[in-house]
Amino acid sequence: MNLKDLYIDYFKGLGHVQISSAPIVPVNDNSVLFNTAGMQPLVPYLLGKVHPDGVRLCDYQKCVRLTDLDEIGDTTHHTFFEMLGNWSLGDYFKEESISYSFNFLTKVLGIPVERLAVTVFRGNDSIPRDDVSYNKWLSLSIPKERIALTFEDNFWIAGDTGPCGPDTEIFYFRSDDEIPSSYDLNDDRWVEIWNNVFMEYEKHADGTFTDLPKKNVDTGMG
C-alpha cells in the first residue's frame, strides 16, 4: 500500500471523509495562479461556510508552487507535488490533531520517536505562546530539547489576508549520522514533513485580526 492510501485509510478510520483534489488552476479565486496548498480550495469553509461533506475531511491535493522555483535542484522541494491533508472544521483542535499526526508517523509508518523534532509558535505582543501544543508534544515523549519555539515560521497564512493561526511543524532526521539529542533549526539533516495549522483568526487588509466563528485545523504533509 502506498503512502497516499495509508494516509487516507488512517484518517477515514478517524471519521474523516475523503474529498477530491481541486483543479490546479483555482476556481473563483484570482489571488493565485495555481493551488499551492490543500487548504486553498477550502478557504470559504475555514471562514465559516458549512461544508457539504461534514466537519472532518481529508484528501491529497495537486499543488504547484512557483515560489519554490529558486529551490529546484535541492533535496527537499518540488514545484509540483501532491499534498496530503486533513481538516477539522470546528470539530477537534490542537491536542487531537497533534495526536493524530504523531500516531500516524510512529504507529502506522513506524518512524522512531527519536527521529522526530517539532517547532511551536513562541507568541508575540498580539497572540500568546502556544502552550497547548508545547505541552502536548511533551506528553508524547518529544523532549524539550527537540521542541523549538519560533515566530515567523510558526504562524501560517496563505496570503496577505484570510484565515490564519499558529502552527506546529514536524521534522524528520533523515541522515544515517548519530541522531542529535537536541533540534537545531540550522541543521539541514532535519527536514520538515508535516505542518499542523490551528486556524483561530482572520487577518484583514488593515493588519488587524479577528476571531474566526469556529476554530479549525488545517494540516499539510509532503
Language-model features and meaning:
Residues M1-M221:
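Alpha-helical segments
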